[in-house]
Amino acid sequence: MSGQPIPDEALGRIGERVILAGRQMDDPATEFELMTALGMLYFQEAKCDLVVLEVGLGGRLDSTNVIPAPEVAVITNIGLEHVEQLGDTHAKIAGEKAGIIKPGCD
């Protein structure tokens, strides 16, 4: 946050909460999902005014897509990446990436 990593104390404390919650899930969470949850809990605890999240995989199915009403969504490029998960054409990948955009989002 503000160019600084999450302090070790907060990382350990929040990490324990995330790991315990993850163990209660029917489907195991991915490492990216666990790290996303940890970051979001830290940002909430720190009462951040603004948080910029980078989508890790596409958009529609990405773990960052839990934000109910983001103010802004930006798609920087549509390349043939993660084709196994997103599709093998630019159109399919664009559709997956557009899944991060929600009503009312600029």
Describe each PLM feature range.
Residues 1-68, 80-94:
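ATP-dependent carboxylate-amine ligase catalytic core
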Residues 72-79, 101-106:
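Conserved beta-strand/loop subsegment of P-loop NTPase cores
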Residues 90-104:
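Catalytic subdomain that performs nucleotidyl-dependent activation
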